[in-house]
């Protein structure tokens, strides 16, 4: 069985035992969270929500918090001897999916 969930403004396809990286959540590492924004349940019997599937939830464990790879933003204006370099690292939370209940 799999589910499509929504968290942090993004959608993820998850199965039991899978590990996903989502936008940073305000939960301690090792704690358990429940995601009730389930857009679709798949497997044998497919259920599509409008917008969410009723009484469906996904239980996940917070594995760790971290920061992603550095993205370099470089802007250069020709003939002006002007340039700007900036870096960004996005915070993330790693989740391990424990259970999908409908």
From Swiss-Prot:
Keyword set, alphabetical order: Ribonucleoprotein, Ribosomal protein, RNA-binding, rRNA-binding
Gene Ontology terms for molecular function: rRNA binding; structural constituent of ribosome
InterPro entries per the UniProt record, alphabetical: bL21-like, bL21-like_sf, Ribosomal_bL21
Pfam families: Ribosomal_L21p (PF00829)
Coiled coil: none
Gene Ontology terms: cellular component: cytoplasm; ribonucleoprotein complex; ribosome
GO biological process: translation
Matching NCBIfam families: L21
Role played: This protein binds to 23S rRNA in the presence of protein L20.
Quaternary assembly: Part of the 50S ribosomal subunit. Contacts protein L20.
Protein's recorded name: Large ribosomal subunit protein bL21
Organism per entry: Nitratidesulfovibrio vulgaris (strain ATCC 29579 / DSM 644 / CCUG 34227 / NCIMB 8303 / VKM B-1760 / Hildenborough)
Taxonomic placement: Bacteria, Pseudomonadati, Thermodesulfobacteriota, Desulfovibrionia, Desulfovibrionales
Gene: rplU
